[in-house]
């Protein structure tokens, strides 16, 4: 009799067996065989619910990114069973796009065996199951973040981009659901931090969540405005994926703290004395700024002073809805002609280069002012990680000014 019971039990699908009777190795082997993966899953999620949506689910967070995950060829979906009989190998309607990496099996006794794909899409039971699974997956991911940080950071490296796309792609509709799962690199702590961790450590006088977007954390940390933010004792999120800034712009704020791109608009971090000095310098050098703007021939909307640049002579900022990093991302897309940020050239009134500009202008040397303007603009582009329009002309300009 004992042997017969063993045999019968082994015929029960793994997702229907009590969790305390299944070893971790059994779950891992099932996952690898069923979903043709060579790595163990990062997390196994089991769920049995009764009531409005009655089902049993066995889900897995993969330990590595499928080779085709970020391509059009990737098919999301969970294997859907009705009373132990598979009715669909990949039911996409059970998963929202932002959780499309989840693999697994869902078995329900409430579904008909001969239900068609078209009927299934309209099935209210399926919608209830999807909503329930969405909450379960979110809670399990957050539990992994809290209780197993190392595993969560592996998950984030593999699939964090998809979570960010989920916020951006749905126009921020799911920011409350997904916001506390987000991680970004901290300039202060030199590691990934959550938005909750960032907000908890904000000094009382800090009003915004500051971020910089670009290709490389080292370069971003050296930006003039990054140095300014850090010098005030504030942390800075360094965003290096193309979706990052779009995601944060769509969220707008987190825990009532607005997201602020350090290279878009006025940061408002100058002291009262610096403000007064800047206003005086703006008035005093109005003609010089007009001349520089004219020399740059439409490349910048405005030229102004920025007294907070410390040792940097120049920087670029952007006005309006498109930042300089967004311009870079959008220009890589098809049909992106004419996509451009509205740039502002900001000069450090306390730098020796500014003194040289003023001297050339006072002496009426318009040729030198034009060369300095072009040089400073190109330098500001390089600092911002943007390509200069004519590298040959830039090299000749530098050599000419050195002679």
Residue positions per predicted region:
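Conserved GHKL (Bergerat-fold) ATPase module
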Residues: 1-403
């Amino acid at each position: 009799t004992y042997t017969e019971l063993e045999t019968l039990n082994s015929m029960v699908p793994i997702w229907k067996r009590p969790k305390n009777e299944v070893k971790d190795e059994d779950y891992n082997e099932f996952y690898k065989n069923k979903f043709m993966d060579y790595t163990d899953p990062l997390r196994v999620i089991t769920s049995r619910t009764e009531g409005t949506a009655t089902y049993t689910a066995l889900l897995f967070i993969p330990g590595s990114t499928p080779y085709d995950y970020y391509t059009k060829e990737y098919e999301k979906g969970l294997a859907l069973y009705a009373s132990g009989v598979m009715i669909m190998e990949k039911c996409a309607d059970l998963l929202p796009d932002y959780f499309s990496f989840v693999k697994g099996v869902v078995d329900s006794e409430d579904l008909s065996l001969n239900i068609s794909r078209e009927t299934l899409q309209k099935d209210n039971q399926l919608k209830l199951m999807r909503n329930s699974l969405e909450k379960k997956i979110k809670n399990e991911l957050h539990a992994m973040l809290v209780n197993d940080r190392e595993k969560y950071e592996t998950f984030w490296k593999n699939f964090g981009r998809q979570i960010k796309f989920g916020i951006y792609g749905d126009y921020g509709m799911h920011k409350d659901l997904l916001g506390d799962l987000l991680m970004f690199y901290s300039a202060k702590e030199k590691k990934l931090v959550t938005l909750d961790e960032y907000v908890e450590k904000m000094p009382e006088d800090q009003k915004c969540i500051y971020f910089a977007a670009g290709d490389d954390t080292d370069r971003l940390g050296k930006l003039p405005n990054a140095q300014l933010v850090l010098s005030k004792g504030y942390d800075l999120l360094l965003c290096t994926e193309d979706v990052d800034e779009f995601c944060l712009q769509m969220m707008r704020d987190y825990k009532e703290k607005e997201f602020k791109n350090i290279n878009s608009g006025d940061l408002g971090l100058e002291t009262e004395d610096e403000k007064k000095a800047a206003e005086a310098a703006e008035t005093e050098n109005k003609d010089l700024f007009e001349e520089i703007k004219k020399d740059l021939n439409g490349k910048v909307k405005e030229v102004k002073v920025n007294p907070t640049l410390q040792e940097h002579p120049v920087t670029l900022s952007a006005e309006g809805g498109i930042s300089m990093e967004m311009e870079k991302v959008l220009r890589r897309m098809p049909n992106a002609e004419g996509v451009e940020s509205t740039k502002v050239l900001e000069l450090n009134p306390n730098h020796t280069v500014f003194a040289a500009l003023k001297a050339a202008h006072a002496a009426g040397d318009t040729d030198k002012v034009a060369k300095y303007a072009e040089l400073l603009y190109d330098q500001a582009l390089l600092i911002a990680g943007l390509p200069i329009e004519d590298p040959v002309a830039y090299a000749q300009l530098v050599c000419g000014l050195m002679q």
